[in-house]
Amino acid sequence: MQDYLQPSAIIDWQHPDILQLAAELAAPWETPAEIAKACFEWVRDQVRHSVDYQMNPVTCRASDVLRYRTGYCFAKSHLLAALLRANEIPTGFCYQRLSIDDQGAPYSLHGFNAVYLPEFGWYRIDPRGNKPGINAQFAPPDEQLAYPVRLPGEAEFEPIFTEPLAIVVEALQAAKTWDEALLRLPDVSLERAEEYSLVPRLRVGRRAG
């Protein structure tokens, strides 16, 4: 479990700004579930999704996501993990493969989090950001992610990674603008998923972001 608490180059939760916000969000609460919900809702609602708001820069490192208050789904999951780890709550990274336009190809990975709660075990949460048609919530033990999996070629993957996938980090760091990133969203075909340790999860959960 300690691996899900570690700082890294991307999940730089020891940054002073992250530590300060993590403490502020946790202050009114006592239980890990209450603190996790507060952090989740802050990232979901206060960090603007890059595409929804057509915002630059393209962020990746948790402290940069906090600084600029914008990011793709992946970047938002990086900040949420940092805030939760700063509060000593084990947090990892999960992925889906989703149709970008709900009509089949092209596809993209979609990133979100799993948090370990003593009362419930591992619980998946998606801080992507709500809008009409998307309503991700924190309501354990029920998972309410942004996108259910429903089309051929889509999948939700079982592993909970301790660090973001390298293919995700590389895609974010290579793009200079939100629209450039949109043209090169990371994808892994189901045929190659095992090469990235992406084993499909046996549950049916909608689209990429």
Language-model segment annotations:
Residues 24, 41-45, 82, 86, ...:
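Residue-level signal for well-ordered alpha-helical scaffold segments within enzymatic catalytic domains
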Residues 17, 24, 31, 53, ...:
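A generic structural micro-environment signature
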Residues 1-68:
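Secondary-structure boundary elements
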Residues 50-109:
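Active-site neighborhood of thiol-dependent amide/isopeptide-bond enzymes
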Residues 9-10, 97-209:
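His-Asp-centered catalytic microenvironments across diverse enzyme cores
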Residues 21, 25, 77, 114-116, ...:
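A generic structural signal for ordered secondary structure
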